[in-house]
Amino acid sequence: MTDKQIEEEIQSKNLNAPRLTPEIIESKIKKCEFHILTEVLTVCVITLENGFTVTGESACASPKNFDKELGEKISKKNAVDKIWMLEGYLLKQKLFEGKNNE
């Protein structure tokens, strides 16, 4: 299931509490770079709007299976998944602080 499909299901179920969306996550990305470090390893380095960086990796066991485009897609997805975790923590902290300040 893609992020877009998940978002559509969330909306169809009218789940409207504070949450992250794929658009929010994408809006945090300032720059995305790819580096091929060996015959089998692709690294995605994402710089966020605040300057923090996250990385994602993709590797295959055999150089015969290496595909640049596929490596970039997988490594970016892995890096973006880390942004979801970071932003999820930040949102939870903001909700916690708001609850404790009431």
Please tell me what each predicted stretch does:
Residues 1-102:
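Domain-level marker for long, solvent-exposed, non-transmembrane regions
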